[in-house]
Amino acid sequence: MDLGDNELTLTPIPGKSGKAYMGSYPDGKRIFVKMNTSPILPGLAREQIAPQLLWSRRLADGRDMCAQEWLTGKILTPYDMNRKQIVNILTRLHRSRPLMTQLSRLGYAMETPVDLLQSWQETAPDALRKNHFISEVMADLRQTIPGFREDHATIVHGDVRHSNWIETDSGLIYLVDWDSVRLTDRMFDVAHMLCHYISEHQWKEWLTYYGYKYNQTVLSKLYWYGQLSYLSQISKYYMNQDLENVNREIHGLRHFRDKYGKRR
């Protein structure tokens, strides 16, 4: 894909829904290019949460194109996800009033737990919504809606799986792919982290370091949002036709419910 602009050539990056590219110039310089990404990228870069934004422009076909610095490093693995740097980045994100204000001005609405369930129901593929096990999970979630205070809502990333974290060769860690950003309870991100990557015996330390109290109220909310995080991943993998990870997430959700369901 050649834009004919400053001789920038775009090469699609596999696995990014056709919206991400490696941009290259004749002199060998490389950049990361994303189509129709979140307009809050400059703010995220200022907070050192996301890579630096180099430029953005509107294409003739109406799409927005943003360029970020090309990072030399690696994508984190599940075994990397217990680092304190990651907790610090999430804390910085969730406590950022400027980013939350910017999202509000862009028209993002506050989402309650009920809204989150409704959003999943409206966007999930029919095959998932009709699945007996998933229908059972959704019914349980509707019966156990956690408390929610709008004045405690924060900006959340919405998809903190390990493949959305990048560590540079210099040791900096960035959170990328902001297509799922929303305004809701910070537990949306926290529960995904804990139920997918952090051993139960480390939950108290992790939550305390983040800033939570470790009590039954928090654990009940963790159980609710943890299930929602599995449903979210199942839906995303299914829509990308990644059935191996769909099955892995369903297995994880079954195990999570079997292990923690009686402790609510």
UniProtKB/Swiss-Prot annotation:
Its main location: cytoplasm. Its EC number is 2.7.1.15, 2.7.1.229. Disruption phenotype: Dramatic reduction of growth rate and loss of nucleoid. Slight decrease in cell length and cell area. Cells form multiple, often incomplete, septa, and FtsZ and Z-rings are mislocalized, with the presence of several aberrant Z-rings in 43% of the cells. Cells have defective DNA content and they have either no DNA at all or chromosomes are cut during septum closure. In many cells, the chromosome is localized at only one half of the cell. Keywords: ATP-binding, Cell cycle, Cell division, Cytoplasm, DNA damage, DNA replication, Kinase, Nucleotide-binding, Transferase. Changing residue 157 to A: Growth defects. Is able to localize to the septum. One of its GO terms (molecular function) is phosphotransferase activity, alcohol group as acceptor. The keyword Metal-binding does not apply. ATP binds at residues 32, 70, 73. The keyword Ribonucleoprotein does not apply. It catalyses: D-ribose + ATP = D-ribose 5-phosphate + ADP + H(+); 2-deoxy-D-ribose + ATP = 2-deoxy-D-ribose 5-phosphate + ADP + H(+). GO terms for cellular component: cell division site; cytoplasm. A motif (Brenner's motif [HXDhX3N]) lies at residues 157-164. Plays a role in cell cycle regulation and chromosome integrity. Activates DnaA-dependent chromosomal DNA replication initiation ensuring that the chromosome is replicated at the right time during the cell cycle. May regulate replication initiation through phosphorylation of a possible second messenger or metabolite, and by interacting with replication initiation proteins. Has ATPase activity with D-ribose and 2-deoxy-D-ribose in vitro, but not with choline. Involved in DNA damage response. Belongs to the aminoglycoside phosphotransferase family. PANTHER family: CELL CYCLE REGULATOR CCRZ (PTHR40086:SF1), PHOSPHOTRANSFERASE YTMP-RELATED (PTHR40086). NCBIfam families: CellCycRegCcrZ. This is Cell cycle regulator CcrZ. The gene is ccrZ.
